[in-house]
UniProtKB/Swiss-Prot annotation:
Top-level taxon of the source organism: Bacteria
Record family assignment: Belongs to the YqgF nuclease family.
Protein name: Putative pre-16S rRNA nuclease
Keywords: Cytoplasm, Hydrolase, Nuclease, Ribosome biogenesis
Ranges annotated as spanning the membrane: none
Annotated InterPro entries: RNaseH-like_sf, YqgF, YqgF/RNaseH-like_dom, YqgF/RNaseH-like_dom_sf
Listed EC numbers: 3.1.-.-
GO molecular function: nuclease activity
Function per UniProt: Could be a nuclease involved in processing of the 5'-end of pre-16S rRNA.
Top-level EC class: hydrolase
Main location: cytoplasm
Example GO biological process: rRNA 5'-end processing
Amino acid sequence: MPAWLADGRTLAGLDLGDKTIGVAVSDRGFAFAHPRPVIMRRKFSLDAAVLLALLKKENVGAVAIGLPINMDGSEGPRAQKSRAFVRNMAQLSDLPFVFWDERLSTVAAERTLIEMDFSRAKRAGKIDSAAAAFILQGVLDRLQSLDSAARTELGGRTEPGPTDAA
């Protein structure tokens, strides 16, 4: 894992909506995404202050933000808003932000909440954080598969040995 994910750090996932920011945070083992309460959007400076305080409290080392790519692979206005949000956050924090294709994450999150028998009213308050958890879980699963592949390439070792040198 990169140094910015060492020392008990976690990862955060964000799902940006027009009215809320869905937030999820990983466990320290980078296996599970846990939804957190949504941040109600007011204006960027206030939203950023609330978000940065939460990221600090949760000991976050990096942030995955959902990038709403259209089904044809193009980027529309919502993707541009997400990119602008990250550009603005980069001026306030040195945390690394990475984009993650969030296609259908809200649909998957809503299906899960329906299966859990949440009423429409309860789903409305949780959908963005559930979508953030889906985004983050995708990142965590990818990290796990990359870590597993690296261990396989290294013959089960976690560090390169003398025969692995180029």
